[in-house]
Amino acid sequence: MISNFLKSNNIKNNSPFRSFCTRYSESHEWIKFNHRNKTCTLGITKYASDQLKSIVNINLPDLNSTITRKQPFGNIESTKTVADLFSDVDGKAVLLNSDVIVDPTIVSHSPEDKGWLIKMESNDFESFNKMMTKSEYGQFLKDINKSNV
């Protein structure tokens, strides 16, 4: 019964009864959504971190800033380039990872754990559910690698 509900509402492998679920964007950010308290944690993927190489500076939004889906909310500067940061969900910044602001190399070493960037309040489950699952993101990366050969 639940699986029929999920299929009919186009919810990808995301039981509404799970507390945490992580999704990935085409711009190589990840979002871990806590459905119970309607917060999410956002960071960049290992792939993005590897592409940037040496991260030297991170600019994040002010606390309580509105984060608009698909609009830049900050950037990461490396020795190679400056890359904008995007969220695939709307929300409000409620916590910034001050550790990565002081020591940006944390993102290089632990992009999907200690290198998280911001925590947001969000009710944007619909946009979150449109993001890629881990397996879909893995296939997305394989397709990128094929096109770069």
Curated annotation (Swiss-Prot):
Q: Kindly list the biological process annotations in GO that this record carries.
A: glycine decarboxylation via glycine cleavage system
Q: Which domain of life is it from?
A: Eukaryota
Which key words are in the record? Lipoyl
Which Pfam families does the annotation name?
Answer: GCV_H
Requisite cofactors: (R)-lipoate
Disulfide-linked positions:
none
Output the InterPro entries linked to this UniProt entry.
Answer: Biotin_lipoyl (IPR000089), GCV_H (IPR002930), GCV_H/Fam206 (IPR033753), Single_hybrid_motif (IPR011053)
N6-lipoyllysine found at: 80
Q: Which PROSITE patterns does the UniProt entry name for this protein?
A: BIOTINYL_LIPOYL
Cofactor binding summary note: Binds 1 lipoyl cofactor covalently.
Q: Which Gene3D superfamilies match?
A: 2.40.50.100
Any one of the GO CC terms: glycine cleavage complex
> What function does the entry list?
The glycine cleavage system catalyzes the degradation of glycine. The H protein shuttles the methylamine group of glycine from the P protein to the T protein.
Please give the subunit comment from the record: The glycine cleavage system is composed of four proteins: P, T, L and H.
Family classification? Belongs to the GcvH family.
Q: What is this protein called?
A: Putative glycine cleavage system H protein 3
| Phylogenetic placement of the source organism | Eukaryota, Amoebozoa, Evosea, Eumycetozoa, Dictyostelia
